Amino acid sequence: MVGSVAGNMLLRAAWRRASLAATSLALGRSSVPTRGLRLRVVDHGPHSPVHSEAEAVLRPLYMDVQATTPLDPRVLDAMLPYLVNYYGNPHSRTHAYGWESEAAMERARQQVASLIGADPREIIFTSGATESNNIAIKGVARFYRSRKKHLVTTQTEHKCVLDSCRSLEAEGFRVTYLPVQKSGIIDLKELEAAIQPDTSLVSVMTVNNEIGVKQPIAEIGQICSSRKVYFHTDAAQAVGKIPLDVNDMKIDLMSISGHKLYGPKGVGAIYIRRRPRVRVEALQSGGGQERGMRSGTVPTPLVVGLGAACELAQQEMEYDHKRISKLAERLVQNIMKNLPDVVMNGDPKQHYPGCINLSFAYVEGESLLMALKDVALSSGSACTSASLEPSYVLRAIGTDEDLAHSSIRFGIGRFTTEEEVDYTAEKCIHHVKRLREMSPLWEMVQDGIDLKSIKWTQH
């Protein structure tokens, strides 16, 4: 029996060993591929939710990094002192405990700013990208509402952006939801035409969370700058994965999430330009922390973790991107070579390689997910995964409803291994073939029948 105290000590020791392993890997990253770091702790304590050793050890492979990434052990190492020893309130200015925490908070602010080419004073800590998106969209719209009552966004934004815009519509604002092309990329001419004299904000995400498409952010920033309209981008899926510079790209507001870049959950940031100054109306009242834009005590351990994750991303981005690109190519080629009628959703070139969305014709996506129970995958955004409706992102790019229902998102990240990619491809190929053999539609296609020519009737 392992008691809770001893279990916690074992957990911390295991993470420290993993951290040392990760550090040694980092030293040789130019030539040695990163191996997946797997931590499986079996706790047989009376309050443990795990009922057997098999359940604890035999966990699925993780291929859903768009939903969340594992915490990098080096990030945990940076956080631990502020969870145990340096627990002062960073806003307490009268003693050393507060000063220590404040210094750590400001260092984290510098680390986040450095990753995106910003001034540290332009970084505001939040609870995550959802809050950052709400502050950016509602904050700008409400501050300038006396003169400007119009916003522009796209139909494929994250749900929190779309819901924020719908909330503003209920307050009397007008919102233009731009369609996207079949590639998933917006038409820049349509964007220019959509901007009106009273447009206050354009919000376009950097990398789509479902299909991985990269929008032309620098070109959008140039258009917004020339029309004197503020430009916000939800960069939760892009920060730390692709190079971003808020000044070169003329970005006025940017949303950042900690748990999408191997940092902790519950923390994020928003970049708000100082020169020329972007004004936002605060969403919550309180002690006026974070320059009055986000009241509430800043959680020092979490922002330290976010800062450490950003610093690691800046150091290792190029290596990670090359490695993830090779693994993604290996996965797609393996599947496409062995399975007919597989469609890759979204633009194959303007695309972040770690997010792969494939549709398997004549297979129901939910059935395939259930069959692939030993691989953690998703059929779309984690924020809408409870819905059985086809993805609104896939509908927006013109995907047929049957293909939209058959889509699976594969996420490849920093700790994904070649063996995991090969195993996932092998299992996917096996189960797609098995499910197709059970499908009358697949049998009809094999017999040469054009399904689109059939007029289906209800009984």
Curated annotation (Swiss-Prot):
Cofactor: pyridoxal 5'-phosphate
Family label: Belongs to the class-V pyridoxal-phosphate-dependent aminotransferase family. NifS/IscS subfamily.
A single cellular component GO annotation: nucleoplasm
Function comment: Mitochondrial cysteine desulfurase, of the core iron-sulfur cluster (ISC) assembly complex, that catalyzes the desulfuration of L-cysteine to L-alanine, as component of the cysteine desulfurase complex, leading to the formation of a cysteine persulfide intermediate at the active site cysteine residue and participates in the [2Fe-2S] clusters assembly on the scaffolding protein ISCU. The persulfide is then transferred on the flexible Cys loop from the catalytic site of NFS1 to the surface of NFS1.
Residues recorded with modification Cysteine persulfide: C383
InterPro entries named in the record: Aminotrans_V_dom (IPR000192), Aminotrans_V_PyrdxlP_BS (IPR020578), Cys_deSase_IscS (IPR010240), Cysteine_dSase (IPR016454), PyrdxlP-dep_Trfase (IPR015424), PyrdxlP-dep_Trfase_major (IPR015421), PyrdxlP-dep_Trfase_small (IPR015422)
Transit peptide: 1-17
Residue sites binding Zn(2+) per the record: C383
N6-(pyridoxal phosphate)lysine modified-residue sites: K260
SUPFAM superfamilies reported for this sequence: PLP-dependent transferases (SSF53383)
Entry keywords, A to Z: Iron, Iron-sulfur, Metal-binding, Mitochondrion, Molybdenum cofactor biosynthesis, Pyridoxal phosphate, Transferase, Transit peptide, Zinc
Activity regulation field: Active only in complex with LYRM4.
The organism of origin for this protein: Mus musculus (Mouse)
Catalytic activity entry: (sulfur carrier)-H + L-cysteine = (sulfur carrier)-SH + L-alanine; L-cysteinyl-[cysteine desulfurase] + L-cysteine = S-sulfanyl-L-cysteinyl-[cysteine desulfurase] + L-alanine
Post-translational modification: N-gluconoylated. Cysteine persulfide intermediate is reduced by thiol-containing molecules like glutathione and L-cysteine. Persulfide reduction is a rate-limiting step of cysteine desulfurase catalytic cycle.
UniProt binding sites for [2Fe-2S] cluster: C383
Enzyme class, UniProt record, top EC level: transferase
GO biological process, alphabetically ordered: [2Fe-2S] cluster assembly; [4Fe-4S] cluster assembly; iron-sulfur cluster assembly; Mo-molybdopterin cofactor biosynthetic process; molybdopterin cofactor biosynthetic process
The protein's name in its UniProt record: Cysteine desulfurase
Compartments where located: Mitochondrion
GO MF terms held by the record: cysteine desulfurase activity; iron-sulfur cluster binding; metal ion binding; protein homodimerization activity; pyridoxal phosphate binding; sulfur carrier activity
Binding-site residues for pyridoxal 5'-phosphate, renumbered to this chain: A129, T130, Q237, S257, H259, T297
Active-site residues from the entry: C383 (cysteine persulfide intermediate)
EC nos: 2.8.1.7
